[in-house]
Amino acid sequence: MSLIKLDNVSVEFPIYNSSSRSLKNRVLSIATGGKIERKTDRLVVIRGLEGVSMTLKDGDRIGLIGHNGSGKTTLLRVLSGIYTPTQGAAFIDGTCVSLINIQLGIDPDATGRENIRLRSAMMGMLPKEIDEKFDAIAEFSGLGDFLDMPFRTYSSGMQLRLAFATSTSVRPEILIMDEWLSTGDEDFKERANKRMHELVGSTKILVLASHSRELLMKNCNRVLWLEHGHLKMDGPTQEVLSAYFGNAQK
């Protein structure tokens, strides 16, 4: 059984040599949604999350909502094991793949074929697994002979196709996503959406951050509402979305 458990988790980002930066700190506070606390004359701390607790189990399809800077990305990175809490504890049991940045690990100067291996290794695949999936990834990308060219020579659309084909080739127990992934021309978008539904359907725990009410209604059975680093509401999808979007219209 897969399990994620957060117990009173807080995440702080220290900023040193911050004296005489009151305007910058204020702008940063607005941009991140976090709280700024001055520890000393030369140390300011931005609190991205504060006292967040939750338990996610098999079958949970979690939607994550909140304004820009509410702490969604910070929470996604904690759930992915990228950030370690500065206070509290995070327990993650199950193979986890994060699709927050699907181009993480890609080398612009390496060929498409080389980058399939680099990105796959970054996601935790073993060499044997990469070998087994390589041809299917290459075929799904639709890049053909361009796979022998450096990644930097690709158009932005081609780069995203390669990154998408590689990143979605896994079948994790826990899937963390920042928005729904879809890219390319109409033919590729159709194939990409089909693959995304297959990926979401096969995972045991899904966490999807999105601003789309329709997307969250379609894919999630529970929604978490973050505000200024705090968990404001946690409940059934319809109930939380009605409260959130109703509040946004006021």
Locations of regions flagged by a protein language model:
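Pre-NBD coupling/linker segments of ABC/ABC-like ATPases
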Residues: 2-47, 242, 246
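Helical segment within the ABC ATPase nucleotide-binding domain
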Residues: 189-201
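ABC ATPase "signature
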Residues: 234-235
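Conserved catalytic segment of ABC-fold P-loop ATPases
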Residues: 218-225
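Conserved ABC ATPase "signature" region
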Residues: 25-35, 117, 129-146
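H-loop/switch region of ABC-family ATPase nucleotide-binding domains
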Residues: 210-211
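ABC ATPase nucleotide-binding domain signature region
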Residues: 3-15, 58-63, 67-122
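Conserved ABC ATPase "signature" C-loop
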Residues: 228-229, 244
